[in-house]
Swiss-Prot record:
Any one of the GO BP annotations: putrescine biosynthetic process
InterPro entries with a match to the protein in the record: Agmatine_deiminase, Peptidyl-Arg-deiminase_porph
MF-aspect GO terms: agmatine deiminase activity; protein-arginine deiminase activity
Protein name as it appears in the record: Putative agmatine deiminase 2
Key word Cytoplasm present: no
Cited PANTHER family: AGMATINE DEIMINASE-RELATED
Amino acid sequence: MGQLKGLPVEDGFRMPGEYEPHIGCFMIWPERPDNWRLGGKPAQQNYKEVAVAISNFEPVTMFVSPNQYKNARKELPDTIRVIEMSNDDAWIRDYGPSFLVNDKGEMRGVDWGFNAWGGLLDGLYFPWDKDNQIAKKVCDLERLDYYSQKDFILEGCSIHVDGEGTLVTTEECLLSEGRNPNLTKIEIEQTLKKYFHVQKVIWLKHGFYLDETNGHVDNIFNFVAPGEVVLSWTDNKSDPQYEISRECYDILANQTDAKGRTFMIHKLHCPDPVLITQTESEGVEAINGTFPRQAGDRLAASYVNYYTANGAIIFPLFDDPKDKDAQELLEQLYPDRKIVGIKAREILLGGGNIHCITQHLPDKSTIRE
């Protein structure tokens, strides 16, 4: 158990698709008052609902700061493991480890650099040192060896893989000046191929409109299965999201995956624009060094930001008529999984959604055929 030399691609380790079997899910309990309104209490209820929903299908571990341990333990059912772990905020998908498996039933992690989505240039909070230690701590907890790439800034929400050699990301995020400004697009792509063991990287131009993380791919795109994808969509041509989604569609429609398959693309219509209310804005404490959210600001509300669990899809609800449409499409796309909707406005107010606040632990016995 410790830091490894070498590269995953040389050692035969790959990142599996999220739809492959899991042995668990990690989350972090929200609390910081400059991001979560009313001291995080409303968001904690949303996180609890997500954790309970996932726990019906796979084990859930909730990491929580020392200040919130008693509260989280009281709020969460005994079926959810609660472990004390210092943190700066509650987005484990972004700074938890990337988990890799091989065909021998072994698992390893990757510890990437994290700088709060842009560092001192356009990051969302400072400091971020506690978050930057979480990947290594989780690997230690799970007794996993890990590769360290601390000089390379990468968030888990910025990439999606199909487990069969294809990775999708956005130029808006990975080429942003606050991430890896000294690396070229080709150099970034080479790193992705070496550490995720993929043969093809597909670059979408942009992520979801006004996504404050510089356009994470998980808010606009997801793999349903190898060769089959879902894309956030709107038919409203006056909405800036329309041109973004259309551009993504055109890129995907003219690409093949690493196996040479053309993509079957499903359009998952996003809700009508969701805006922050005055009351919600006033409930967040204003602190220097954090990114303020004002009344009337549009939030990046997308149904694509869902979690694929063992036997289930946990997706966000926005109290919009399209909630029902999203449920119906997901039921068609995942006939063998239960589709569970969770009201997720409080998570959205914090800057992300269900996929962002969860990190799956793959089943290390997953073997590629």
